[in-house]
């Protein structure tokens, strides 16, 4: 009889609060659009159970309650959202506040899409290793032996690196970060799909575009950051490096962008929280949440690329126009060209113009 206690009430009501040390919160959110002024309303109990609130909805109200509650660091929140047409209770509010999320189930009923989404704090609230300066966050991450969601960020990186051994030039105030993810993740999904999915969720968090396979660009096509995967044979974990510029400018005669161009003045810690939540949403391992599926990774990756392409990005190869039409299961780009449908796995053969 002491295992379950039931109390009536909810967020926003006097005297109601989230119980201390809560580890699981489940809510079938009311998702009917709130009635406009002059429209008929339901009975009081039906209105409370079925209709959402305006301006952020019940979801934002719960998010605010959690900000002052003393729940466990590993508390998991599971909610049912109406995502199409969009409900006031939007998953985006949780992402912007640094919560990771993963789709658990979805269903299309008539003209509505319902999704069950889980939310948690990356690393169960364990902070990253923060360095004022280092040679490379990839090298610093190599020194970490502790299990769990481990990441390193540095506000100044002296000797960063990019794809194929190229250098990644950073200025003081930029963001250089490395995450450690289990190597079996990359083995299961392939490096190509892994880095494209990461590029897609990071670009979404920063309100940018992703260029296949892993560059973060502004709407105007200027590069803001990039993603790099490294992992030795037999290593239990793979390093995911992400570099982001704070300010735009010019590098070797090429225009670059910074997060302040799209987000406005923002602290590096704030940007890291958004990116950390995005990466954890894909690959953090939780005992109570199923791993992300290959199909979901493909959907996320192609959605990110499609948003960029839908804005008029022109892609060519060897001077001839081509049209990206999809991704293979390994994250390779499928192109429609003059000779038919082809697959490419090397970005160097393509030219992207926003």
Stretch-by-stretch model annotation:
Residues 67-71, 78, 89-104:
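A SAM-dependent methyltransferase catalytic signature shared across enzymes that methylate proteins
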Residues 1-19, 24:
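S-adenosyl-L-methionine
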Residues 6-10, 105, 132, 210-212:
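Short loop/edge segments at beta-strand edges and connector loops
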Residues 31-32, 82-86:
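Short "lid" loop at the C-terminus of a central beta-strand within the Rossmann-like core
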């Amino acid at each position: 009889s002491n295992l379950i206690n039931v109390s009536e009430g909810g967020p926003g009501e006097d005297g109601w609060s989230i119980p201390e040390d809560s580890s699981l919160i489940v809510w079938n959110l009311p998702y009917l659009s709130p009635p406009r002024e002059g429209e008929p309303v339901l009975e009081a109990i039906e209105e409370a159970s079925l209709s959402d609130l305006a301006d952020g909805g019940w979801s934002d109200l719960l998010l605010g309650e959690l900000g002052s509650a003393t729940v466990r660091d590993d508390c998991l929140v599971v909610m049912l959202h109406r995502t199409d047409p969009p409900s006031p209770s939007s998953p985006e509010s949780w992402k912007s506040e640094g919560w990771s999320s993963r789709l658990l189930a979805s269903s299309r009923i008539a003209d509505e899409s319902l999704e069950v989404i889980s939310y948690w704090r990356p690393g169960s609230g364990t902070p990253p290793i923060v360095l004022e300066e280092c040679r490379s966050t990839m090298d610093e991450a190599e020194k970490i032996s502790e299990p769990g969601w481990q990441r390193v960020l540095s506000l100044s990186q002296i000797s960063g690196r990019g794809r194929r051994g190229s250098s990644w030039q950073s200025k003081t105030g930029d963001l250089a970060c490395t995450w450690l993810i289990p190597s079996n993740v990359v083995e299961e999904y392939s490096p190509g799909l892994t880095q494209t999915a990461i590029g897609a969720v990071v670009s979404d968090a920063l309100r940018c575009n992703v260029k296949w396979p892993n560059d973060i660009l502004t709407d105007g096509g200027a590069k803001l950051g990039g993603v790099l995967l490294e992992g030795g044979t037999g290593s239990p974990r793979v390093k995911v490096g992400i570099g982001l510029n704070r300010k735009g400018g010019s590098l070797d005669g090429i225009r670059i962008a910074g997060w302040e161009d799209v987000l406005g003045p923002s602290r590096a810690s704030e940007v890291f929280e958004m990116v950390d939540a995005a990466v954890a949403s894909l690959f953090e391992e939780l005992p109570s949440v199923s791993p992300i599926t290959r199909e979901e990774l493909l959907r996320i990756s192609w959605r990110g690329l499609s948003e960029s392409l839908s804005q008029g990005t022109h892609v060519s190869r060897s001077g001839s126009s081509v049209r990206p039409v999809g991704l293979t299961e390994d994250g390779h780009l499928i192109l429609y060209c003059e000779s038919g449908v082809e697959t490419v796995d090397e970005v160097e053969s393509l030219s992207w113009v926003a």
